[in-house]
Amino acid sequence: MSKIVVALGGNALGQSPEEQLELVKGTAKSLVSLIQKGYEVVISHGNGPQVGSINLGLNYAAENGQGPAFPFPECGAMSQAYIGYQLQESLLNELHVLNIDKQVVTLVTQVEVAGDDQAFNNPTKPIGLFYTKEQAEQTMEEKGYKFVEDSGRGYRRVVPSPMPINIVELDSIETLIKHGTLVIAAGGGGIPVVKEEGNYKGVDAVIDKDKTSALLAAHLKSDQLIILTAVDYVYINYGKDNQEALGEVTVDEMNQHIADGQFAKGSMLPKVEAALQFIEKNPEGSVLITSLEDLGDALDGKIGTLIKK
């Protein structure tokens, strides 16, 4: 049985609980179809829009005397539970329809990062809602947040995105998998924690979910990491007249494309970097990057970008 880790993009999950629940129902059908085909599946997901909205809402309430402000690690934990619950419910319902007897568990996951990671001095991870340039400038002036333009879609707040070095609950994830459980873990890249004198402490950051998914997939010795995003392929010369979709490519070819500056820092670059990190740790594995809608065809080799050693 092939083991795969599927990383869902947070932006593909919608902007509200109602929209997300409807989208997740379709996602569940696609994921359960993998189980029907005989794959052993582990699920991770992004949380960029969701954790940003949670943080924004709670801080707005605090500023208006309606409750305390919440630190980012707690907001990350809330987003893991919120997204995980909706995935869990939809997956269980779809499994029930198909008479598949399988438990689904969302595991709130901490991921260790280095306290001296240079990312803390250079925020790059987009979170939350999209703003106009004027809105972003006003919020920067009022709150001191850093904003960047995100792939032509508007401006988003950015926070530090340190490298994941250790998944704290890895043993628990492996135990659940061995017992046949469908596991949702490392949501949003995991809650970032640093280790101080043997104790863990949460820090204000968002770990890139694809890089944590790559680390998880490598530890689990997965046959494949699937990164689901908004596009059907990885492209070079994206948005230009000579735009080109990448089909099956090697690690060396992707490294050359990175050197040529082909991938945007806030969107496709971390996905490609995560793919290469997984293959570096697990040379026999491969990475498939495509959209959720095209997943079935991508697994049949008809579409999507497949990266191999």
From Swiss-Prot:
Domain of life of the native organism: Bacteria
Pathway membership, UniProt: Metabolic intermediate metabolism; carbamoyl phosphate degradation; CO(2) and NH(3) from carbamoyl phosphate: step 1/1
EC number: 2.7.2.2
CC per GO annotation: cytosol
Major site of localization recorded for this protein: cytoplasm
Family: Belongs to the carbamate kinase family.
Annotated protein name in UniProt: Carbamate kinase
Protein's organism: Staphylococcus haemolyticus (strain JCSC1435)
